[in-house]
């Protein structure tokens, strides 16, 4: 359960439009420091992320594109009106680029996508001062509980040791490793979580 002063809510794409600036600001704060500084998000629904230009590295435009995709969902944690954490994701489409640029190939039966197979947890971020209070786990559970997909996937920087540990405790397993965008900047572990088993 979240701390009493934290309000959690789940938003669809249209509702998430009003949270774009808050999400961009929090992401810039958290991702401006290692191990996140040199890795950009790939558009989990099929297109590679834009180049890192502008104050937010193009994130605002990517977030705007992603929130318009079918099935997009944003989970927020707020203290009063102040955003302290968020998670968002979309279902993968058959033409996704999610499984490209792996450091080693995977079997096609693992990487082939069809509607309803995989939900991509594109980002989960908690403001530094609010960590270790269970907010990350609450956001994780809020966005994934009740999903219709068979599994979820996430890509976590190899150097993000605390995040790696959290995902492992939450039942995720490593499936592959891939390069972040732009190429040569960082390595990401591609993780999977079986949703059909209720874990």
For each feature predicted by the language model, list its residue ranges.
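Short hydrophobic/aromatic beta-strand element in the GNAT-like acyltransferase core
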Residues: 71-76, 86, 118, 123, ...
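Conserved GNAT acetyl-CoA-binding A-motif
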Residues: 119, 145-159
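Conserved acetyl-CoA-binding loop-helix of GNAT-fold acetyltransferases
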Residues: 121-128, 132-145, 168-169
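Conserved active-site alpha-helix within GNAT-family acetyltransferase domains
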Residues: 137-138, 151, 158-185
């Amino acid at each position: 359960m979240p701390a009493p002063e934290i309000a959690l809510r789940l938003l669809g794409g249209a509702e998430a439009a009003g949270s774009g600036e808050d999400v961009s600001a929090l992401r810039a704060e958290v991702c401006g420091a290692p191990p996140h500084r040199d890795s950009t998000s790939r558009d989990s629904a099929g297109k590679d992320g834009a180049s890192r230009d502008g104050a937010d590295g193009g994130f605002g435009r990517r977030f705007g594109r992603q929130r318009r995709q079918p099935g997009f969902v944003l989970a927020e944690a707020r203290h009063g009106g102040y955003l302290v954490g968020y998670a968002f994701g979309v279902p993968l489409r058959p033409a996704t680029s999610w499984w490209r640029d792996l450091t080693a190939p995977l079997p096609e039966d693992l990487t082939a996508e069809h509607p309803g197979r995989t939900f991509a947890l594109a980002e989960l971020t908690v403001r530094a001062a609010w960590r270790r209070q269970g907010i990350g786990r609450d956001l994780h559970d809020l966005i994934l509980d009740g999903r219709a997909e068979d599994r979820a996937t996430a890509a976590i920087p190899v150097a993000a040791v605390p995040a790696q540990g959290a995902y492992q405790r939450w039942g995720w397993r490593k499936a592959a490793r891939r390069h972040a965008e732009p190429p040569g900047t960082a390595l990401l572990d591609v993780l999977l979580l079986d949703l059909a088993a209720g874990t």
